[in-house]
Amino acid sequence: MTAPSTPKPSRKKPKPASPAKPATPREKASLHPRNRHQGRYDFPQLIKSTPELGQFVILNPYGKESIDFADPAAVRVFNRALLKAFYGIAHWDIPADFLCPPVPGRADYVHFLADLLASHNQGEIPRGAAVRVLDVGVGANCIYPLIGYSDYRWQFLGSDIDSTALAAAKAIVQANDLNKAISLRQQGNPKQILTGLLDSTERFDLTMCNPPFHASLDEATRGSQRKWRALGKADPKRKLPVLNFGGQARELWCEGGEIRFVSQLISESASVGQQVLWFSTLVSKASNLPAIESALKKAGALESQVVEMSQGQKQSRFVAWTFKDKAQQQAWSQERWMRKN
């Protein structure tokens, strides 16, 4: 999505937000306990269910089976195999040059959001169609709705400004007969994120977002080159994709970068604050958190959290915030989940 100038929310100034408090970090490289992707992958089993993966399997420098993560085709087929083997998604494909995200990290985000809902439901994760989630910027891959429905049977609405991405996501949804669980909607104004997207009667228990985190195409390319070096693929004689793991320009960068996009998302969330229990977004850089906390205070968020995650050598996090006080949060859970679980 393309981020414009951040609009100023027209609303009364509420009580100051509780400071965003980082969760206690877990052990390095530890996935969420409910994440299906613990340990090494059983490549023979993956190849059995997705035979086309076989042509991409190699031995890494440690003699273990893997794939070449510098090859977008290999990553795409690997994701297809994982989604089929672990989540029962029989048909999955995306157009060339669209973001092909690593599945384990995306699953972690979903599981930690489930924990957030459980904290309002006597420690029990609310499951089924009673829970509605908005995926802001669903992309062609439709990854969060697929995981969230498979693991928790939640209902999803995926939004995007890109009609090609939505067409690809729709093809995935229809091919897997998930039309009743996953809906898609185009944000008609590419300069807006939430504004004008939702009906006034719609309610969502969660929103989630994987924002564009670079401020320019050049910055995105440099970030990709750093990843290639980390993967040991920075061979100047080898032609590599410009952007790591694919990704259209608007998926990876926007004017002002992550801070501007997330600040706008927060600002716009204030206008629909009573329609959503918890908003959330991934944040790629910990150094962006102070600016994001300032945006939360400015928007009038009453509570916020920073949840740290780890996948292999990668450290990631998401920020969650709400415009509801404790009493309103409790009333929400009683009305929407406790009667239906």
UniProtKB/Swiss-Prot annotation:
Uppermost EC category: transferase
GO biological process: rRNA base methylation
Keywords annotated in UniProt: Cytoplasm, Methyltransferase, rRNA processing, S-adenosyl-L-methionine, Transferase
EC number of this enzyme: 2.1.1.181
Gene3D superfamilies found in the cross-reference section: Vaccinia Virus protein VP39
Region of interest (Disordered), residue spans: 1-41
UniProt-listed CDD domains: AdoMet_MTases
GO molecular function ontology, one term from the record: 23S rRNA (adenine(1618)-N(6))-methyltransferase activity
Localization annotation: Cytoplasm
Domain of life: Bacteria
Catalytic activity entry: adenosine(1618) in 23S rRNA + S-adenosyl-L-methionine = N(6)-methyladenosine(1618) in 23S rRNA + S-adenosyl-L-homocysteine + H(+)
Role summary: Specifically methylates the adenine in position 1618 of 23S rRNA.
NCBIfam families found in the cross-reference section: PRK11727.1
Family per similarity comment: Belongs to the methyltransferase superfamily. METTL16/RlmF family.
Name the UniProt record assigns to this protein: Ribosomal RNA large subunit methyltransferase F
Gene that this polypeptide is encoded by: rlmF
